[in-house]
Amino acid sequence: MKILVTGVNGQLGHDVMNELAKWNMEAVGCGTSPVYKGIRNGSPVESMPYEQLDITDRNQVFEVIRRVHPDAVIHCAAWTAVDAAEEPENIPKVRAVNVDGTKYIAEACKAIDAKMLYISTDYVFNGEGTAPWEPDCRDFAPLNVYGQSKLDGELAVSSILQKFFIVRIAWVFGINGNNFVKTMLKVGKTHSTLRVVDDQIGTPTYTFDLARLLVDMVQTDKYGYYHATNEGGYISWYDFACEIFKQTGYDTQVIPVTTEEYGLSKAKRPYNSRLDKIKLLKRGFNL
């Protein structure tokens, strides 16, 4: 089986490529840079086949996908800077990547009868209540530009393809790229106290584990919508920060605050990022 992976310079795409290498599967990575520019740690992705690809260029998307001719595309590339997405000058760029780029990939997959696995987010929901969001729930109500763009990407994939997986994830962290864990480790070195919100609830998800799931999933025909997070229950960002400092031995004091008290974000965040993963388990997948 041959897999094309978008966004391999990011934290999830990086780990997906390395997981594919473990399976000895034929894989081609792509990103906007001329060559791979992710973290250099001696992992397989550094020497695996790579294609420069601007997913906002429809002609280029079709040219690359037709030439590589994969059996499946794992689409990890996305605009993920949630606050920057709110800037008026950035909105067209966000939608070009997350909506148009996703649509072009879906159309190209259809043209060669390839599967597509699209990475989405809990941000397609409004975060109200406390019940975990189910994968087949259609009560979409994004609170921000990023969430709306990812939802529109979902709708593009599901309207164009029949052979698709839409996997919503939340609170992702990994070795490559920027994430909450790295931010806490950096800030913890220079601050004796730190304010972290305690009223947004979700589940941290390690890209290493997520990559293993995605590679397993894409080899099946169990198409549909899924929610994928690590085990361990639901926690707040405050809880997560406390555990990070506990594990690393930092003595940084973490002060719990509400989202309103924190008040620094341009984009609204959902309070309830709990994702129900029972469907994932019922279909024989593990994370």
For each of these PLM feature ranges, what is it?
Residues 213, 220-266, 271-272:
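Mid/C-terminal beta-alpha module of Rossmann-like enzyme folds, strongest
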Residues 55-97:
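NAD(P)H-binding glycine-rich loop region in Rossmannoid oxidoreductase-like domains
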